[in-house]
Amino acid sequence: MSKAPKDTKVVIGMSGGVDSSVAALLLKQQGYDVVGIFMKNWDESDELGYCTSAEDYEDVRRVCDQIGIPYYSVNFEKEYWDRVFTYFLNEYKAGRTPNPDVMCNKEIKFKAFLDHAIKLGADYLATGHYAQVDYSDGEYRLLRGVDTNKDQTYFLNQLNQYQLSKAMFPVGHLQKKDLRQIALDAGLATASKKDSTGICFIGERNFKEFLSNYLPAKPGKIISLDGEVKGKHDGLMYYTLGQRKGLGIGGAGTGEPWFVVDKDLEKNILYVTQGETHPSLYSRGLIGADLQWVSENPKPSVIKCTAKFRYRQPDQGVTVYVEEGNTCRVMFDEPQKAITPGQAVVFYDGVVCLGGATIDQILK
């Protein structure tokens, strides 16, 4: 960082949550020229979406007033609809389970919002993510947050060198409990606010009900792997591989619980199997699409590393075979359960996040 903090303008994306509130406070304490910006990504007048954005913006206003920084709201509803929500619906239509957070970071926070921040004269864009950036051997590296339980590099895996060169993660070195304490000690309005969970535009509402407003549900049969009809499903898009709850089959006296093992989109059949250790729930590898490495240095065609296939999962040993057209074949050291097409596979070397891909196919 060549300029002194007081001459360095940092735009911080504020959500109204405690993480971004403390991030803003720390930047201000470190002497940066800080501006808080609240992103509005969903149209609240659209009754189908649930949004707490009016309350959240009020929290941003209160925190920014407390710490003495200017604040604005910026509207990215159109960009969000075009680049994230349309993708979200298309993935569900294709029978997959998308991860809108990964796409939102790639296309909105660190693209549309970053562009906006730079137009405002910002040197950096900061967020409340639990992650860290460092500069080593002429490249930026994305590192896990110190609080391993909160680390959010899984959702940031698609960020490139330019995006990381402009990113600041002021709370990445903190444990969550210490972050809360900082907020309480400073008397921040958001100090005791609970963390948001779930997909931002659905909020606390029923997921099935939300999705049915946008995509027509096509009920069909639930069939076991040995061909027996077990019941009816409400529409394949409502089910995820490995899912156990909400199938409406089984119950007391029917033996082990049932799990979703496959979806046949053409025939509109949901396949299930009984028992959580059934071999059909496991796979030995996957094909990844849209592979993006954080580093721009040439990669070997075969890489031994660890990977996560879902957020907060312990790292698993893998071998990545880099193939043409931004695809890769990932073979697991140990068979993995319930790998889900549409989700992210994210690669690590110790604390360094190497990048990631979208799970495209499962290799049984």
Curated annotation (Swiss-Prot):
SUPFAM superfamilies attached to this UniProt entry: Adenine nucleotide alpha hydrolases-like
Swiss-Prot/TrEMBL site (Interaction with tRNA) positions: H129, Q343
A GO-annotated cellular component: cytoplasm
GO MF annotation, one: tRNA-uridine 2-sulfurtransferase activity
Localization of this protein: Cytoplasm
Cysteine disulfide partners in this protein: C104-C200
Assigned EC number: 2.8.1.13
Enzyme's top EC category: transferase
PANTHER family to which the protein is assigned, alphabetical: MITOCHONDRIAL TRNA-SPECIFIC 2-THIOURIDYLASE 1, TRNA 5-METHYLAMINOMETHYL-2-THIOURIDYLATE -METHYLTRANSFERASE
NCBIfam families named in the record: PRK00143.1, trmU
Protein name per its UniProtKB record: tRNA-specific 2-thiouridylase MnmA
Organism expressing this protein natively: Alkaliphilus oremlandii (strain OhILAs)
